[in-house]
């Protein structure tokens, strides 16, 4: 959530910055809500002052033995008016909060302006695209003999699911373990095991709710008893779309000791996404699934360190690609292609030979204080006043897409897969992965 004071100070400037994100700020609605809020607060203060005056007058009259009935009647009416005003103010503040919840983050000044992904800025290219002297296969054809099975997954669950068996399941597990170990041992992250289902407050904290509910898998749970309408009481849980949600929420409603910052967490979880807006896209293979594994990096920092932390976190994700010997490029997203809560984002795109294209394998973002304000996540130095933290997150990496890139880039003429040296210890020293 952006700072409401920015809207109150210079709403035109905020409107202009949001327009670069293709977001049209409803200035009229905010001004209407804000005008009523100010009016109610002013009226409440006036009534409070009047009530205080009447209380003194009533006390003086009673002290003198005089009749204070008129003043008491007026004070009673003021109490009624104040209760009514407080009720309306509470509703109004909730409406303002809902309005603010729907506004995306403001882009950092270093982010290039642009309408969509065609105007993103390539900032780095690493590695050489492999040259093959045989007709290459895509990961679906390569993966079949290695244990990749979409047919049985469709029978069990439907489209956009996969079953991994045998050699390819082992490779998938090895990739995740390699990523976790590298980040925990060499990059200084604390490993976290977190819930795969979270409550609505956690989803609101990181920005998935209310805007992106259709992209989530909701799991209602009956709590027992009935609500006021006679319906069974239920509580909604959500399957996590990314470990960013539970891990970032570790600091929700907390005041962190400044001396402990930065906090650096890594988690390996399955991720669940409905892909509501992706009909017809990437229908073949593992690129876009309802369930996929990801190793997620999260950093919690002081405001003055967040941009430096973004470079560091992105570098940690890049290191995984380099150790896996996978060609990639690093792209700075323009304002029109950024995620809802991001103030600055780098995408890492890995080379996929069968598509003759780079495909996203990691997105690394600084959220500034956007999530922290929603979560009331703060830090405190000494006897100072609590301040909002800055939060960052990134994939380090998406395991399924790493698997796709690895078997396609490292394929051999006989259908076996050359294993990068860094990954060999996780596969018992295997140099090549062969079909059963």
From Swiss-Prot:
<keyword id="KW-0067">ATP-binding</keyword>
<comment type="similarity">
    <text>Belongs to the class-II aminoacyl-tRNA synthetase family. Type-1 seryl-tRNA synthetase subfamily.</text>
</comment>
<keyword id="KW-0436">Ligase</keyword>
<comment type="function">
    <text>Catalyzes the attachment of serine to tRNA(Ser). Is also able to aminoacylate tRNA(Sec) with serine, to form the misacylated tRNA L-seryl-tRNA(Sec), which will be further converted into selenocysteinyl-tRNA(Sec).</text>
</comment>
<dbReference type="InterPro" id="IPR033729">
    <property type="entry name" value="SerRS_core"/>
</dbReference>
<dbReference type="InterPro" id="IPR006195">
    <property type="entry name" value="aa-tRNA-synth_II"/>
</dbReference>
<comment type="pathway">
    <text>Aminoacyl-tRNA biosynthesis; selenocysteinyl-tRNA(Sec) biosynthesis; L-seryl-tRNA(Sec) from L-serine and tRNA(Sec): step 1/1.</text>
</comment>
<dbReference type="Pfam" id="PF02403">
    <property type="entry name" value="Seryl_tRNA_N"/>
</dbReference>
<keyword id="KW-0547">Nucleotide-binding</keyword>
<dbReference type="InterPro" id="IPR045864">
    <property type="entry name" value="aa-tRNA-synth_II/BPL/LPL"/>
</dbReference>
<dbReference type="GO" id="GO:0004828">
    <property type="term" value="F:serine-tRNA ligase activity"/>
</dbReference>
<keyword id="KW-0963">Cytoplasm</keyword>
<dbReference type="InterPro" id="IPR002314">
    <property type="entry name" value="aa-tRNA-synt_IIb"/>
</dbReference>
<dbReference type="InterPro" id="IPR010978">
    <property type="entry name" value="tRNA-bd_arm"/>
</dbReference>
<feature type="binding site">
    <location>
        <begin position="360"/>
        <end position="363"/>
    </location>
    <ligand>
        <name>ATP</name>
    </ligand>
</feature>
<dbReference type="InterPro" id="IPR042103">
    <property type="entry name" value="SerRS_1_N_sf"/>
</dbReference>
<dbReference type="InterPro" id="IPR002317">
    <property type="entry name" value="Ser-tRNA-ligase_type_1"/>
</dbReference>
<feature type="binding site">
    <location>
        <position position="296"/>
    </location>
    <ligand>
        <name>L-serine</name>
    </ligand>
</feature>
<feature type="binding site">
    <location>
        <begin position="273"/>
        <end position="275"/>
    </location>
    <ligand>
        <name>ATP</name>
    </ligand>
</feature>
<dbReference type="InterPro" id="IPR015866">
    <property type="entry name" value="Ser-tRNA-synth_1_N"/>
</dbReference>
<keyword id="KW-0030">Aminoacyl-tRNA synthetase</keyword>
<dbReference type="GO" id="GO:0005737">
    <property type="term" value="C:cytoplasm"/>
</dbReference>
<keyword id="KW-0648">Protein biosynthesis</keyword>
<protein>
    <recommendedName>
        <fullName>Serine--tRNA ligase</fullName>
        <ecNumber>6.1.1.11</ecNumber>
    </recommendedName>
</protein>
<dbReference type="Pfam" id="PF00587">
    <property type="entry name" value="tRNA-synt_2b"/>
</dbReference>
<feature type="binding site">
    <location>
        <position position="395"/>
    </location>
    <ligand>
        <name>L-serine</name>
    </ligand>
</feature>
<dbReference type="GO" id="GO:0005524">
    <property type="term" value="F:ATP binding"/>
</dbReference>
<dbReference type="GO" id="GO:0016260">
    <property type="term" value="P:selenocysteine biosynthetic process"/>
</dbReference>
<dbReference type="GO" id="GO:0006434">
    <property type="term" value="P:seryl-tRNA aminoacylation"/>
</dbReference>
<comment type="subunit">
    <text>Homodimer. The tRNA molecule binds across the dimer.</text>
</comment>
<feature type="binding site">
    <location>
        <begin position="242"/>
        <end position="244"/>
    </location>
    <ligand>
        <name>L-serine</name>
    </ligand>
</feature>
């Amino acid at each position: 959530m952006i700072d409401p004071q920015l809207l109150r100070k210079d709403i035109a400037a905020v409107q202009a910055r949001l327009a670069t994100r293709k977001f049209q700020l409803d200035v009229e609605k905010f001004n209407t809500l804000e005008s009523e809020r100010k009016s109610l607060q002013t009226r409440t203060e006036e009534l409070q002052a009047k009530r205080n005056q009447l209380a003194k007058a009533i006390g003086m009259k009673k002290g003198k033995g005089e009749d204070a009935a008129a003043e008491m009647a007026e004070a009673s009416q003021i109490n009624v008016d104040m209760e009514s005003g407080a009720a309306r103010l509470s509703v109004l503040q909730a409406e303002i909060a809902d309005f603010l919840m729907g506004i995306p983050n403001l882009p950092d000044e270093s982010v290039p302006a642009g309408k969509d992904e065609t105007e993103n800025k390539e900032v780095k290219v690493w590695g050489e695209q492999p040259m093959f002297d045989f007709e290459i296969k895509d990961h679906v054809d390569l993966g079949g003999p290695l244990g990749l099975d979409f047919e049985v997954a469709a029978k069990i669950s439907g489209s956009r699911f996969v079953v991994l068996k045998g050699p390819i399941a082992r490779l998938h597990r090895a990739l995740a373990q390699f990523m976790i170990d590298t980040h925990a041992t060499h990059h200084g992250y604390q490993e976290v095991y977190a819930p795969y289902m979270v409550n609505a407050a956690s989803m609101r904290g990181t920005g998935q709710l209310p805007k992106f509910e259709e992209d989530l898998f909701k799991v209602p749970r009956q709590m027992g008893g009935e609500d006021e309408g006679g319906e069974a009481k239920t509580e909604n849980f959500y399957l996590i779309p990314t470990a960013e949600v539970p891990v970032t929420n570790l600091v929700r409603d907390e005041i962190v000791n400044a001396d402990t910052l930065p906090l650096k967490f890594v988690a390996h979880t399955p991720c669940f996404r409905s892909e509501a807006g992706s009909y017809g896209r990437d229908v073949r293979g593992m690129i876009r699934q309802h369930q996929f594994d990801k190793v997620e990096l999260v950093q919690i920092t002081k405001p003055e360190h967040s941009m430096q932390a973004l470079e560091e976190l992105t570098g940690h994700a890049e290191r995984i690609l380099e150790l896996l010997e996978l060609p990639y490029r690093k792209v700075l997203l323009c304002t029109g292609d950024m995620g809802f809560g991001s103030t600055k984002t780098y995408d890492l795109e890995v080379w996929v030979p069968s598509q003759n294209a780079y495909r996203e394998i990691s997105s690394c973002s600084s959220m500034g204080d956007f999530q922290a304000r929603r979560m009331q996540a703060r830090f405190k130095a000494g006897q100072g006043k609590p301040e909002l933290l800055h939060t960052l997150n990134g994939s380090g990496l998406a395991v399924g897409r790493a698997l796709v890139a690895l078997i396609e880039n490292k394929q051999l003429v006989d259908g076996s897969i050359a294993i990068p040296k860094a990954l060999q210890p996780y596969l018992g020293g295997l140099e090549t992965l062969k079909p059963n």
